[in-house]
Amino acid sequence: MSFSPLIRQLIDAFRVLPGVGQKTAQRMALQLLERDRSGGSRLAQALGQAMDGVGHCRSCRTLTEEELCPQCADPRRDDTLLCVVEGPTDVYAVEQTGYRGRYFVLKGHLSPLDGLGPEAIGIPQLMERISQQGTFTEVILATNPTVEGEATAHYIAQLLHDKGLVASRIAHGVPLGGELDLVDGGTLAHSFAGRKPIAM
């Protein structure tokens, strides 16, 4: 089927979302245009406001509308623990476990084949944060249990070991090959409780 340029543009815009293919994007676009124009307008307005108003926390780099996210602005958090995650969705997943320490959000994981080295994902900024804060006694590496996530955790653990800092890895109650934001809170809480230091 051939779509007009504006409909094609809308379909292509929906396809930037993860897990949305051609058919799903077509259904979404046609649903909004045929049956829910007011919903489409609300979606466009909310998307525009979020794109303009949401940035990154200057401390942990998660998504926020303020200079500091709620976790970094909270003085009651444990300043001796730092949890390193791959993305903002992982912060929300870890928060469900009752974790009360600080965070640092990488921009993904190491993937040399995709051109993502330490600088691209923010490892130098992580090491700078650890040095500047000076209060962390344990760094919990909560990268995804994928090959790339494991490689990222090992790389960071080596840097921390060289500085005499303790690095731990969340236990693997989280399924290998899984994504943190898809794991239920109970499983993730069990994984955090069973974390172990990374031996060097």
Curated annotation (Swiss-Prot):
User: What this chain does, per the record?
Assistant: May play a role in DNA repair. It seems to be involved in an RecBC-independent recombinational process of DNA repair. It may act with RecF and RecO.
What InterPro entries does the annotation carry?
A: DNA_Rcmb_RecR, Rcmb_RecR, Rcmb_RecR_Znf, TOPRIM_dom, TOPRIM_RecR
Could you tell me the Gene Ontology terms of the biological process aspect for this record? DNA recombination; DNA repair
Q: Name one Pfam family in it.
A: RecR_HhH
> Which parts of the sequence are C4-type zinc fingers?
57-72
Which residue ranges does UniProt annotate as crossing the membrane? Answer: none
Family statement:
Belongs to the RecR family.
Sorted UniProt keywords = DNA damage, DNA recombination, DNA repair, Metal-binding, Zinc, Zinc-finger
Could you state a single Gene Ontology molecular function term?
A: zinc ion binding
Domain Toprim: residue ranges: 80-175
Source organism phylogeny: Bacteria, Pseudomonadati, Pseudomonadota, Gammaproteobacteria, Pseudomonadales
Name-wise, this protein is: Recombination protein RecR
The yes or no answer to whether the keyword Acetylation is present is no
